[in-house]
Amino acid sequence: MPGIVVMGTQWGDEGKGKATDLMSERVDYCVRYSGGNNAGHTVVVGDEKFFMHLLPSGVLNPNSTAVLGNGVVLNLDVLADEIDALRGRGVDIPHPLISANAHLITPYHQTLDKVTERFLGSRRIGTTGRGIGPTYSDKINRMGIRVQDLFDESILRQKVEASLDQKNQILVKIYNRRAIDPGEVADGLLAHAERIRPYVVDVARVLNKGLDEGKVVLFEGAQAHHLDVDFGTYPYVTSSNPIAAGACTGSGVGPTRIDRIVGIAKAYTTRVGEGPFPTELCDDDGERLRSEGGEYGVTTKRPRRCGWFDALVVQQAVMINSVTDLFLTKLDVLTGWERIPVCVGYDIDGERTDIMPVTQSDLHHAKPVYEFLDGWSEDISTARSFDDLPRNCQAYVRRLEELVGTRVSGIGVGAGRDESVVINDLID
């Protein structure tokens, strides 16, 4: 049975939660492998909306075990609140399995994240202020605190004190902030130790054993390809590897265990925060997309920047991630447009290119070259097969397939769990 990666092909907020939830009924393990509570997933079940920041979307399926891999950075307060909130709404979820090697977000990581963004001013990255970047920085600098450290109080306190010896110097002398008490930080972390102890496991062994036994393992990426720290629009990126390859390093399974890679793409494009965005619309069309698409961040509540579908952006992600199937979301938002532009190339200082440029300088100068496709006016929210879609809508999907270089296997035609068109089975 397969290992399946679900990952975003644009700049996040593509609707990965919807696709994951759709597949989760047939999944044994649903794994988050990167990022932290800077991500936001929305799943609509009936009349209820569920917002999750840390737990994988598959947690709403009682037959699927949620897993937080070593590539995730954990805010234990957020994890506890999220679990309690879901249970408070009557969702009977087991506690997720947690990698002993996952790193912990502390209050000083969050403080550093916020004051650094303020200090940068107009040069800011546009982070969520959740402490994600500073936590990954400590991980790379070998100063991080891991989940397993919770179970050795002496080690934990030593690590917190050593880290704050340095960070308090920065906070006090550079940012003019008060020093953070290492004892308070350690006490706050240790308060979670006994609650999570039963769920801390060797995630790599659990997942590999499951795959050996024929279980279905779904790896749910946070953020998206173009926010990847290596392949994204650097420096306007996240601090981890949400690309498909990150599923291996962030959970402990080898690349040969991955059988299918499902890329998620909106039928148009959005972005939150700073960074280049060639097809961005700063006019009434952009406001219409934002309004009709409900484009406000789950985590930050910030209005998302909106623009037309950029085939070069998605094609790049399809290539680097070896995407086998594309799930196209929010196609219904485009209903009612007489003509729909699709970016098929860039004009960079008078030169035409049909692929994403190598340098960020060129991307910042890129002007979109559009192809115009006929729109449709029919309501598509009740479509459940590809043939149910209007002819022009079908033509739009087929043209996107040609441009990005992979097949569209699923389409979101509304916010609800059942408002989807499945063209090709995403698991078998």
From Swiss-Prot:
Its cofactor is Mg(2+). Belongs to the adenylosuccinate synthetase family. It comes from Cutibacterium acnes (strain DSM 16379 / KPA171202). HAMAP family: Adenylosucc_synth. Plays an important role in the de novo pathway of purine nucleotide biosynthesis. Catalyzes the first committed step in the biosynthesis of AMP from IMP. The keyword Protein biosynthesis does not apply. Binds 1 Mg(2+) ion per subunit. The keyword GTP-binding applies. This is Adenylosuccinate synthetase. GO terms for biological process: 'de novo' AMP biosynthetic process; IMP metabolic process. Mg(2+) binds at D13, G40. The active site is at D13, H41. Disulfide bonds: none annotated. Its EC number is 6.3.4.4. NCBIfam families: PRK01117.1, purA. Homodimer. It is an enzyme of class 6 (ligase). GTP binds at residues 12-18, 40-42, 304, 330-332, 412-414. GO terms for cellular component: cytoplasm. Substrate binds at V298, T299, T300, K301, R302, P303, R304. It catalyses: IMP + L-aspartate + GTP = N(6)-(1,2-dicarboxyethyl)-AMP + GDP + phosphate + 2 H(+). The lineage of its organism: Bacteria, Bacillati, Actinomycetota, Actinomycetes, Propionibacteriales.
